[in-house]
A protein has these predicted regions:
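Amphipathic alpha-helical
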Residues: 1-10, 38, 43-85
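Residue patterns forming the tRNA-binding/recognition surfaces of aminoacyl-tRNA synthetases
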Residues: 1-25, 115-188
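Extended, domain-scale alpha-helical bundle/helix-rich regions
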Residues: 14-49
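Short, flexible, solvent-exposed loop/turn segments with mixed acidic/basic and small polar residues
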Residues: 30-32, 103-109, 152-155
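Short glycine/proline-enriched turns and hinge-like loops at secondary-structure junctions
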Residues: 37, 111-113, 131
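Structured DNA-binding interfaces in DNA transaction proteins
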Residues: 84, 102, 140-143
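Catalytic-site beta-strand/loop segments enriched in glycine and acidic/polar residues
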Residues: 88-124
Length: 188
């Protein structure tokens, strides 16, 4: 999966369990510290999970459009973010919360696992997508300890401290990454 990447991405894989036959959707993230800000799961148009609704006409139309206009990772960041809302949800691995599953035109099947968790407050593409589809935008990183921040047009992608994140609160990003990866590994 990662053999075609330029450079190396450090991160972890997280399994999200769907409400469809408890099917797992595996995501790869370089920012596990932002998991408490996840408001959606986005999968590639050709992700295996799409088999469960492949005969739905609206999905077929979306998939055709998305695959026709799909390009490289860098060109995807410039394109309009489009999504198809599936009828399914996943359970957040650390909260009693359901997260919607979307098929998105900015996710590539051959990059990572072909699925991401969207954290709109801290990723610009996720923010554009969340605004378009009225999804929650919850900041979980702040430049100052214990201080909330407001996200408007630009995601906060700088260094800082974790907020709104239960057992990760007040940790640095690096310390939070280590702690959340340990918790994820314990759940396996």
């Amino acid at each position: 999966m990662q053999k075609n990447w330029i450079g190396k991405s450090i991160g972890c894989e997280i399994d999200f369990v769907s409400d469809f036959k408890n099917t797992k959707i595996k995501i790869f993230t370089t920012r596990p510290d932002t998991i408490f800000g996840a408001s959606f799961i986005a999968i590639a148009p050709d992700h295996p999970f799409t088999e469960y609704f492949k005969n739905e006409k609206n999905f077929q139309d979306f998939k055709e459009l998305a695959l026709k206009n799909i390009g490289t990772e860098s060109s995807l960041s410039k394109n309009e973010k489009l999504g198809f809302k599936t009828p399914f949800f996943v359970s957040h691995p650390f909260l009693n919360k359901k997260i919607p599953i979307y098929v998105a035109n900015f996710i590539l099947m051959d990059y990572g696992t072909g699925a991401i968790f969207g954290c709109p407050a801290h990723d610009q593409r996720d923010l554009e997508f969340a605004k378009k589809y009225n999804l929650e935008i919850l900041p979980v990183v702040s430049p100052n300890k214990s201080k909330s921040i407001t996200i408007s047009d630009h995601a906060y992608a700088d260094d800082g401290y974790i907020i709104n994140s239960d057992f990760l609160n007040n940790l640095t990003i690096e310390d939070a990454k280590k702690k959340i990866i340990q918790k994820i590994e314990k759940k396996r």
